């Protein structure tokens, strides 16, 4: 198949746009977790989200109920000032499975203050995103 330079550039531009969109969506998802924003989190996730993470003890968790539990935990005492938390992705890498599905892998960095000292925690995450009815949805996560 012969593709013109314009076709190739248009495809590359579309992939770059989709990559930026997915990274932005994933960042919003991560921020919703640290902010306890269930509405944003659940809007970005498929209702049949699956995951492997430390909290599942090696068992595949299916659905949003598992995640909802953590959002519903009581916040810190009101007498304590909120501790700022920053979450970011180091070296995000996207592997396209199809135009409507992608695997996003990165190291998640979480920065916060503990007892007056800045602390950075890291973990490796792989998230699968799928475009469902024209909207990108988070469908699987594996965290270690």
What do the PLM-derived regions correspond to, one by one?
Residues 29, 67-70, 89-95, 107-110, ...:
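Hydrophobic/aromatic beta-strand elements that line small-molecule binding cavities or substrate pockets
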Residues 111-119:
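Short, cysteine-centered beta-strand-loop-beta hairpins and adjacent loop/turn segments enriched
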Residues 19-20, 38-100, 119:
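A solvent-exposed, acidic/Ser-Thr-rich amphipathic alpha-helical stretch
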Residues 2-3, 120-144:
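Short beta-strand edge/turn micro-motifs at domain boundaries
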Residues 94-103, 116-117, 129-135:
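A short, structured loop/turn motif at beta-sheet edges
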Residues 1-47, 52:
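Short, low-complexity N-terminal intrinsically disordered segments enriched in polar/charged residues
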Residues 45-46, 108-110, 142-143:
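Short beta-strand segments enriched in hydrophobic/aromatic residues
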